Amino acid sequence: MTGKITTLLFDLDGTLINTNELIIKTFQVTLQEFLPDRVFTREDILPFIGPSLMETFREINPAHADEMRAFYREYNLKHHDDLILEYDGVYEAIRALYEEDYKLGIVSTKMYDTIMRGLKVTGLDKFFQVVIGLDQVSNAKPDPEGIEMALSLLNATKEEAIMIGDNYHDIEAGKNAETLTAGVAWAIKGPEHLAQFQPDFMLEKMSDLLAIVRDEE
């Protein structure tokens, strides 16, 4: 493969695997535990999807942010395998990219072990050469550190890479790292939300990536 795009970096949650209901349920339980006098609707929780847990909890309840994060992670791991879902066509598209020798990596705001658990449950783990979790970087997305680390480990340059994600943190991180960017229309916040951050591409389905990388050759 000698095309312009050789390297594809993906967010995990809401992009490769559908963890939306797991995340929302975990936030609901955590918030009820620590802030029982406040009511958080589903719509209230949607903005929490994407940022790191500490960023969210420090904004909501700074005095108990560490405790909330620990409670969240414990509940999330306990219910992880039962509540995550696969997106149609993702496995097939990632397998096709892998079989065509594209370099594939993940850059997520989740911890490495939790990323790997989700990948193994969905069978995607065998396709990714590099996985960067929050515990491997000093600065979470939209800082470009994770993307730059992944590119270095993959021996790839920003000019030949694209960052794919479902949240503005992913698009902004890609722009900050000076890669191409793609949003996913199946993002829980909707394609209109992502479009305002001007990704280079908007994927209606994951297989759209195959056409994009082939067109760049």
Swiss-Prot record:
Under the cellular component aspect of Gene Ontology, which terms does the record hold?
A: cytosol
EC annotation?
Answer: 3.6.1.1
Q: Where is the active site?
A: D11
- Alphabetized UniProt keyword annotations: Hydrolase, Magnesium
Q: Which InterPro entries match?
A: HAD-like_hydrolase_sf (IPR050155), HAD-like_sf (IPR036412), HAD-SF_hydro_IA (IPR006439), HAD_2 (IPR041492), HAD_sf (IPR023214), PGP-like_dom2 (IPR023198), Pyrophosphatase_Ppax (IPR023733)
- Reaction catalysed by this chain? diphosphate + H2O = 2 phosphate + H(+)
Q: From which domain of life does this come?
A: Bacteria
Transmembrane spans:
none
Q: Which GO terms describe its biological process?
A: DNA repair
The cofactor required is: Mg(2+)
Recorded GO molecular functions are: inorganic diphosphate phosphatase activity; magnesium ion binding; phosphoglycolate phosphatase activity
Role: Hydrolyzes pyrophosphate formed during P-Ser-HPr dephosphorylation by HPrK/P. Might play a role in controlling the intracellular pyrophosphate pool.
Q: Which family does it belong to?
A: Belongs to the HAD-like hydrolase superfamily. PpaX family.
Q: State the name under which the record lists this protein.
A: Pyrophosphatase PpaX
